[in-house]
């Protein structure tokens, strides 16, 4: 399970060091893909394969499904962390997420998200006040 908030730096070569506590879960390979709110999602390879299989079952006659599958496939990059736990984020991914040197990696239960630190702070300011209401609306009787 991926939990917590971490603040790694992006180096000049576009490399980001993954939090040490997640490296074992990601050692078999990982998939970096464009996600919502201009963040990046990092999935263990096996979890991403399951997600892609489910998504590919959508009817190809549906234009939204086709667009989603195209964006998912085109916006995904397979990575293997190096011996220091670093992954290289593509220029396209860095541009999409507006990543600067200061990044935030958050655990999102079954995957990680990578954010630009300022974008994450802005997101938090907007959404923190509505956290209680959102949990009631989105999660209903679960909590």
From Swiss-Prot:
Disulfide bridge positions per record: none
InterPro entries (UniProt xref): MraZ, MraZ_C, MraZ_dom, MraZ_N, MraZ_sf, SpoVT-AbrB_dom, SpoVT-AbrB_sf
An MF annotation (GO) of this entry: DNA-binding transcription factor activity
All copies of domain SpoVT-AbrB, residue ranges: 5-47, 76-119
Subcellular location: Cytoplasm, Nucleoid
Keyword set, alphabetical order: Cytoplasm, DNA-binding, Repeat, Transcription, Transcription regulation
UniProt xrefs under Pfam families: MraZ
NCBIfam families assigned: division/cell wall cluster transcriptional repressor MraZ
Note from the entry: Was identified as a high-confidence drug target.
Quaternary structure annotation from Swiss-Prot or TrEMBL: Forms oligomers.
Protein name: Transcriptional regulator MraZ
Natural source organism: Mycobacterium tuberculosis (strain ATCC 25618 / H37Rv)
């Amino acid at each position: 399970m991926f939990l917590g908030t971490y603040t790694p730096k992006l180096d000049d070569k576009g490399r980001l060091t993954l939090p040490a506590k997640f490296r074992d879960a990601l050692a078999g390979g990982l998939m970096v893909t464009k996600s919502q709110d201009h963040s990046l999602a990092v999935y263990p390879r096996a979890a991403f394969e399951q997600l892609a299989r489910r998504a590919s079952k959508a009817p190809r006659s549906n234009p939204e499904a086709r667009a989603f599958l195209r964006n998912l496939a085109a916006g995904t990059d397979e990575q293997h962390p190096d011996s220091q736990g670093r992954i290289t984020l593509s220029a396209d991914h860095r541009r999409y997420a507006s990543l600067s040197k200061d990044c935030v990696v958050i655990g999102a239960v079954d995957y990680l998200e990578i954010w630009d630190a300022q974008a994450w702070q802005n997101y938090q300011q907007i959404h923190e006040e509505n956290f209680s209401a959102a949990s009631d609306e989105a999660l209903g009787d679960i909590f």
